[in-house]
């Protein structure tokens, strides 16, 4: 049982020794916790693998549009008019805003929204369930794909499940809303 997302699964890769002890093959992501529930007498699957190997299908590359609450961007970039509600910045790739050269962005503390449109490469079947790995996030991120909320990633492995059929061949809209802590602003 995975307490992070509430999922559970059979663990077919197991053996029971002559002494009655059960040995189960487990795989943990860094800092991950799982509950192992052993039940007497309940049939479980004996074929398959405990933890399927996830293989990358594609990388969402290219520019992202990132918006920040202008009230918390200090100093404002020269291109932003005083009184603006948002500051919109183009990032070359999905990246940590605290690594940006602009002081108002680098020291920003609050919520920022990353937006990206992308197409699936030829050969990728959108009718299969997948995972979206968003890399390391500081501190948490809510992920939406094509208008559907995929949940919050707040610890490793920094990924969310993408239900079968949600992806389209083209014009997929990915929105990642990231929140950090005041620590970033206090470092100034």
Q: Predicted segment positions?
A:
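Surface-exposed, short loops/turns at beta-strand junctions within beta-sandwich domains
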Residues: 28-29, 166-169
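C-terminal beta-strand-rich structural cap/linker in extracellular carbohydrate-active enzymes
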Residues: 20-44
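Aromatic-lined ligand-binding clefts that engage carbohydrates, nucleic acids, or primary amines
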Residues: 107, 118-120, 124-146, 174-178
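Extracellular Ig-like/FN3 beta-sandwich strand-entry sites
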Residues: 33, 127, 169-171
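Short beta-strands within extracellular/lumenal beta-sheet-rich domains
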Residues: 108-122, 158-161
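Solvent-exposed beta-strand/loop surfaces of large extracellular or lumenal domains
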Residues: 1-22, 138, 144-160
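Short, hydrophobic/aromatic-enriched beta-strand segments in well-ordered soluble domains
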Residues: 34-41, 116, 173-180
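An acidic-aromatic loop/edge-strand motif
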Residues: 44-110, 168-188
